[in-house]
Amino acid sequence: MKEKIKEKILNLCNLCGKCVPVCPSYRVYKKESFSPRGRLFLLSHEIEHKSFEFCLFCERCERICPHHIGFPTFYLEKLKEKENPLLTFLNLNNFINLINLKKELPTKIMKEEGDIIVYYSCGLKYLYPSALERFEEILKKRGISIGVPKGLVCCGAIFLNLGLISNLKENALKNLEILEKTKGYLVIFCATCLWMFKKIYPQVFKDTKYEKGFIELSKRAISAYNYLSLKAEDELKILEEKKLRENILFHLPCHLTEDFNLVKNKIETRDFCCGSAKFFLWLKNFQKENKRLWVKNLENIEILATFCTGCYLNFNALLKKPPLILHWLELL
């Protein structure tokens, strides 16, 4: 590991332990080595440990830390130094088939240019396309057009979870090539995709010729909910009204926290970690263990609405109906 990274960890982490109780993997395993504090200690002493793979990249440790340092940021720097590891690849289709995929919106009906740009993510294509339909209907009434450029690919979060940084970079560069030719807000419907664009891309390409391009792109990225709060705030009142009439729980994904803080008073949410859609953790049965920590939130809940593709997949795989799993904006 680079000396400056080791030095930063040792200088900034004062071992206060605020990060320990908020870490999902620590809450399951109750071992210091599985806490952010323990991982940072091991990382700073160049000790490889199996607990590193149990990091969910949720960044709860960073948000609560007095110095705003967290294990994921430093772990990503370490992953950048490595070649892609030899991994046993899972058949992604087997995981996706745990839920009933909805039909992808026909791309021929979507214009490539508009007043704003929508990142056509995996979730929008296959899991909750009606969220985009509803979003477009609302903006159309206000004379705002959306553009969905062709050729956009997965944000690469799946590669980050597998430690495949070169594959992540490949997808990021494809998206940059297309999106830097566009203008206006880049509206994103998935919390993890938003996190990738706003934080991970700039960090992965730091000190490269692409850094500036990704920083500019990150400034344009905004959640679809936040954008509606700016342009159609009255429409969002429907969500709170429905919550009062029906047994709906609005789940706040880990990666939406910072963006959502800008508008958090407009809807009541529950903040808990789904356990990540990281495939390695499914192999270790982590998600089922972690479920015990959050399932108590769902008593008498008929609809569980989230804003993240990974959470959407996890909830569908772990829960029997009810509750029905939806995207927030499908309820508009």
Label the predicted regions:
Residues 1-33, 39-45:
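Long terminal accessory regions outside catalytic cores
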Residues 286-302:
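A short, acidic, amphipathic alpha-helical segment used as a generic capping/interface helix at domain edges
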Residues 10-28, 53-70, 121-125, 151-162, ...:
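Local cysteine-cluster metal-coordination motifs and their immediate loop/turn environment
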Residues 177-178, 302-303, 316, 323-332:
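Active-site anion-handling motifs in enzyme catalytic cores
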Residues 116-119, 125, 224, 228-266:
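Basic- and aromatic-lined ligand-binding clefts that recognize polyanionic substrates
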Residues 183-185, 300-303:
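Short active-site oxyanion
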Residues 10, 34-205:
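Iron-sulfur-cluster electron-transfer modules
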Residues 208-240, 269-276, 320-332:
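Short, flexible loop segments at boundaries between secondary-structure elements
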